[in-house]
Amino acid sequence: MTAQQTYTNVCKKLWAYFGGEAPAAVVPADEDLALGVFAGLYREGFRLAGKRVHILGTGSFADALAACLKNGGAAGVTVGEANDDTVPTTGSALRGAPGDTASETIPGGAAYYIRLAGGEEPALARLTGAEGVCDLTVLPLRSRLLLDAEEADLLTSGGVYPLAAAVGIVRGRILGTAPAPSEIEEVVRRYLRGASDIAVTGLLGDGASAVAEALSRLTRRPFVRVGRGNVAEAFAGATGRLFLLEEGVAADPAALATVVGNGRCVFVAPPLDTLKEGGGDPARAARYRSVLGIYTAFCDRTYEHTGDPQDTARRIWDDFLRAPYLKRSK
């Protein structure tokens, strides 16, 4: 089986896991990224089942995302160009303007408006924007790394406790509605999992194993190596352990769901310079990009590993595992 066939099969399994079939016309890159967007929306507390959604944008990715949202249970999904008439200005003004696609197709307009913004080398859909409009900005990998650090800083800046910050995040992301207690609790738990399991994963040869071992020593957590066949057994029982997920775990949606439901997961990426076109290792870069969307859809953060496991482990500990639980000292 070729790498492309393996990649396609994994995509199909993930689509099936979320309750639908991938549209035949969608190219693999769009299919993969759309699945990542859908998983990201789900993880961030968006509940689109039974909701009307209008995607402000066109193209193969918009079509792939629409198909994914329909498979995920949205009551109706329309796609169209963005303009001033279709974008609500505030959370209380969710509406479709007369004559636009959303209003004509879905009476009363859409419950959610998703605006797409492009970027080269897409790696992740990032949720931004004011209440009432969800901006999905597709960012380059380097931007993802920087923004993750900024978010960790935001959660602790100004002496704000993470509980208050998490509630504020939920209010901004449950668009146009009052946040339900269960949705608040879900996000709060995700930011306050200091005693739960931590999983480290990455592609073979990129240093994830060495980073996981260093992080295990740093956090004084028992180290557990997990393969595709023993995920459920490994995650059963006590919490507070550190897991190294072998590469094959990403091919099993049920295994990934177990990982997501039991703790936090970080993805160890190779040095970004090795992934640039015209430099580094082209074969390695192609292999990395082929599975990037699948990993980032289920991992909380991505960290660039530049060769020193202790340094990478320290960065993960400082801005991801420790910082969100501490009040910033003046």
Each language-model region and where it sits:
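Glycine-rich adenosine-cofactor-binding loop
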Residues: 31, 49-74, 81-82
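Glycine-rich phosphate-binding loop used to anchor ATP phosphates in small-molecule kinases
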Residues: 228-264, 268-269
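N-terminal ligand-binding/catalytic initiation module
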Residues: 1-25
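A glycine- and Lys/Arg-enriched "phosphate-lid" helix/loop adjacent to the NTP-binding pocket
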Residues: 261-294, 301
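NAD(P)-binding Rossmann-fold cofactor-contacting core
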Residues: 72-94
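Conserved substrate/cofactor phosphate-moiety recognition/catalytic segment
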Residues: 206-239
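Rossmann-fold NAD(P)-binding glycine/threonine-rich loop
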Residues: 13, 129-173
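NTP-dependent small-molecule kinase module
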Residues: 176, 180-198, 210-214, 293-330
